[in-house]
Curated annotation (Swiss-Prot):
Family affiliation: Belongs to the histone H2B family.
Species in which this protein is naturally found: Tetrahymena thermophila (strain SB210)
Protein name: Histone H2B.1
Keywords: Acetylation, Chromosome, DNA-binding, Isopeptide bond, Methylation, Nucleosome core, Nucleus, Ubl conjugation
Domain of life: Eukaryota
This protein's encoding gene: HTB1
InterPro entries attached to this UniProt entry: Histone-fold, Histone_H2A/H2B/H3, Histone_H2B, HISTONE_H2B_site
Record's function text: Core component of nucleosome. Nucleosomes wrap and compact DNA into chromatin, limiting DNA accessibility to the cellular machineries which require DNA as a template. Histones thereby play a central role in transcription regulation, DNA repair, DNA replication and chromosomal stability. DNA accessibility is regulated via a complex set of post-translational modifications of histones, also called histone code, and nucleosome remodeling.
Taxonomic classification: Eukaryota, Sar, Alveolata, Ciliophora, Intramacronucleata
Modification type N6-acetyllysine: residues: K5, K42
Gene Ontology MF terms: DNA binding; protein heterodimerization activity; structural constituent of chromatin
Length: 122
């Protein structure tokens, strides 16, 4: 007995999958300041460690501080009817947000970092 052949119409109706253009779900990397916090900790107290919970708290604190400085700086730019954010607005925002001596130290360290960066790029 000969094998049965499928009807021609049924053979043409093969379902083809459309090529998928979906990207694979990659694990999103979150940017943290953990390595920098750890470096500063070791400069100040070489024999002290930090727990994961404390590191998360410090990271949140730094993110919050940067966000507040950026928000205040952008308000100053809009208030002065300018289009460019300069170091002057950032310094003023730091003076407004941080108390006395802490603001002075932050501004001097920031100025030092900008000067170092400017000299290295030239």
């Amino acid at each position: 007995m000969a094998p049965k052949k499928a009807p021609a119409a049924a053979a043409e109706k093969k379902v083809k999958k459309a090529p998928t253009t979906e990207k694979k779900n990659k694990k999103k990397r979150s940017e943290t300041f953990a390595i920098y916090i750890f470096k500063v900790l070791k400069q100040v107290h070489p024999d002290v460690g930090i727990s994961k919970k404390a590191m998360n708290i410090m990271n949140s604190f730094i993110n919050d501080s940067f966000e507040r400085i950026a928000l205040e700086s952008s308000k100053l730019v809009r208030f002065n009817k300018r289009r460019t954010l300069s170091s002057r607005e950032v310094q003023t925002a730091v003076k407004l947000l941080l108390p006395g001596e802490l603001a002075r130290h932050a501004i001097s360290e920031g100025t030092k970092a900008v000067t170092k960066f400017s000299s290295s790029t030239n």
